[in-house]
């Protein structure tokens, strides 16, 4: 971030006076759009809804009821629900061109597509009882996303569509909350046709990303630095970086490398002309507590609930002195997995451990050059991943 700030200062000083660092391409209009605007911009229908969870969080969700290629057929369609990863939002699924974005591809393939948002991100930052300015609002991690957000959202979607089941597609933390929800909530698990897991994350024992250094900071020091509320929210300056800094010659490589350092390198597979769209909507924010939960996972190498810091606190939340482990062998939902050999967050060794514990693994493919973000943004994602998903969903619908 400081490197990008320095670049912004240099560009402001030199670029305006000497004509240096010219823009590589015009700013994409989706930079300033919300989710439904991004959808309709490409000629797709969009619907916005709000889901209220059992504990009062208000989640914005979006729907693409049909595609551009099949608008004449308005009958009931099979449902596909897409859930984003850490520090992200539903925009991840629609940030590329229509022929490169999974949400649009599924809509054109005849699916009723729904895009979820996890509590605390840009589109899910309200609660019936707590203000986002309060500490209480931010007292959550991916535990609560699995316990409250997923059940409420899936229940809403199925009631709205009149369907009994849906296809679930998760990326990164979107798979994490799926693993938890579908292994601890058998009733919910029965409502999932198939779980499509992209860059799945359960344990993070072997992850080698630079974020590990941040995760190793003691909790008290982490809170001293970042507070105890929101972590890395979307800010107007992100949009400035995306449109006025990262869209310029040479600096665009600096910006893309900032992503690669965290998620793994696959330099030839990122559409640089869409970089301003990616960066203007990400990061979308989460809670400090959620990041601390991931920090605990890095340190322990275990897949378990949030440790509240003392046996007494844990007893209050779990009726036991230690946070419970999540048992992946209890998840019997059919699951198809895609992971990347160059993924620094969902490390292949961690994925191998995960695969060995899944009792109903129906498909697995490892893509050697793929990093963590390739599954949502890679230029060849349709050929490498999405076409397989569409084909498998079609078979599952018969």
Curated annotation (Swiss-Prot):
<feature type="glycosylation site" description="N-linked (GlcNAc...) asparagine">
    <location>
        <position position="99"/>
    </location>
</feature>
<keyword id="KW-0442">Lipid degradation</keyword>
<protein>
    <recommendedName>
        <fullName>Gastric triacylglycerol lipase</fullName>
        <ecNumber>3.1.1.3</ecNumber>
    </recommendedName>
</protein>
<feature type="active site" description="Nucleophile">
    <location>
        <position position="172"/>
    </location>
</feature>
<keyword id="KW-0378">Hydrolase</keyword>
<feature type="active site" description="Charge relay system">
    <location>
        <position position="372"/>
    </location>
</feature>
<dbReference type="InterPro" id="IPR025483">
    <property type="entry name" value="Lipase_euk"/>
</dbReference>
<feature type="glycosylation site" description="N-linked (GlcNAc...) asparagine">
    <location>
        <position position="271"/>
    </location>
</feature>
<dbReference type="GO" id="GO:0004806">
    <property type="term" value="F:triacylglycerol lipase activity"/>
</dbReference>
<dbReference type="Pfam" id="PF00561">
    <property type="entry name" value="Abhydrolase_1"/>
</dbReference>
<comment type="similarity">
    <text>Belongs to the AB hydrolase superfamily. Lipase family.</text>
</comment>
<keyword id="KW-1015">Disulfide bond</keyword>
<keyword id="KW-0325">Glycoprotein</keyword>
<keyword id="KW-0443">Lipid metabolism</keyword>
<feature type="domain" description="AB hydrolase-1">
    <location>
        <begin position="82"/>
        <end position="377"/>
    </location>
</feature>
<keyword id="KW-0964">Secreted</keyword>
<dbReference type="GO" id="GO:0005576">
    <property type="term" value="C:extracellular region"/>
</dbReference>
<keyword id="KW-0732">Signal</keyword>
<feature type="glycosylation site" description="N-linked (GlcNAc...) asparagine">
    <location>
        <position position="34"/>
    </location>
</feature>
<feature type="signal peptide">
    <location>
        <begin position="1"/>
        <end position="19"/>
    </location>
</feature>
<dbReference type="InterPro" id="IPR029058">
    <property type="entry name" value="AB_hydrolase_fold"/>
</dbReference>
<dbReference type="GO" id="GO:0043231">
    <property type="term" value="C:intracellular membrane-bounded organelle"/>
</dbReference>
<feature type="glycosylation site" description="N-linked (GlcNAc...) asparagine">
    <location>
        <position position="327"/>
    </location>
</feature>
<dbReference type="GO" id="GO:0016042">
    <property type="term" value="P:lipid catabolic process"/>
</dbReference>
<feature type="disulfide bond">
    <location>
        <begin position="246"/>
        <end position="255"/>
    </location>
</feature>
<comment type="function">
    <text>Catalyzes the hydrolysis of triacylglycerols to yield free fatty acids, diacylglycerol, monoacylglycerol, and glycerol. Shows a preferential hydrolysis at the sn-3 position of triacylglycerol.</text>
</comment>
<dbReference type="InterPro" id="IPR000073">
    <property type="entry name" value="AB_hydrolase_1"/>
</dbReference>
<feature type="active site" description="Charge relay system">
    <location>
        <position position="343"/>
    </location>
</feature>
């Amino acid at each position: 971030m400081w490197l990008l700030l320095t670049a912004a200062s240099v560009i402001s000083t030199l670029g305006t006076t000497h004509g240096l660092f010219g823009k590589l391409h015009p700013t994409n209009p989706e930079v300033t759009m919300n989710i439904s605007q991004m959808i309709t911009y490409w000629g797709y229908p969009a619907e916005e809804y709000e889901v209220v969870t059992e504990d009062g969080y208000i989640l914005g969700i979006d729907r693409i009821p049909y595609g551009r290629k099949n608008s004449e057929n308005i009958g009931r369609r099979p449902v596909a629900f897409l859930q984003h990863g850490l520090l992200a939002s539903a925009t991840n699924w629609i940030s590329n061109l229509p022929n490169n974005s999974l949400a649009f591809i599924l809509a054109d393939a005849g699916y009723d597509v729904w895009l979820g948002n996890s509590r605390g991100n840009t589109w899910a930052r309200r609660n019936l009882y707590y203000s986002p300015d309060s500490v209480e609002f931010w007292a959550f991690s991916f535990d609560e996303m699995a316990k409250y957000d997923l059940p409420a959202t899936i229940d809403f979607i199925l009631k709205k569509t009149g369907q009994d089941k849906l296809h679930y597609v998760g990326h990164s933390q979107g798979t994490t909350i799926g693993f938890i929800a579908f292994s601890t909530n058998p009733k919910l698990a029965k409502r999932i046709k198939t779980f499509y897991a992209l860059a799945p994350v359960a344990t993070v024992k072997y992850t080698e990303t630079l974020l590990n250094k941040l995760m190793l900071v003691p909790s008290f020091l982490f809170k001293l630095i970042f507070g105890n509320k929101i972590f890395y929210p979307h800010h107007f300056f992100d949009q400035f970086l995306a449109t006025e800094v990262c869209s310029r010659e040479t600096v665009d490589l600096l910006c893309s490398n900032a992503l690669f350092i965290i998620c793994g390198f696959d330099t030839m597979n990122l559409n640089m002309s869409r970089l301003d769209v990616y960066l203007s909507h990400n990061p979308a924010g989460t809670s400090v507590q959620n990041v601390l939960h991931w920090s605990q996972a890095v340190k322990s190498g275990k897949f378990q609930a949030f440790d509240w810091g003392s046996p007494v606190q844990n007893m209050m939340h779990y009726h036991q002195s230690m946070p419970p482990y999540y048992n992946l062998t209890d998840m019997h939902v059919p699951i198809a997995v895609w992971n990347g050999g160059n993924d620094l967050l969902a490390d292949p060794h961690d994925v191998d451990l995960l695969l060995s514990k899944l009792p109903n693994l129906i498909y697995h493919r490892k893509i050697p050059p793929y990093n963590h973000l390739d599954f949502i943004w890679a230029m060849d994602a349709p050929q490498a991943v999405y076409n397989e998903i569409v084909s498998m969903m079609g078979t599952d619908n018969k």
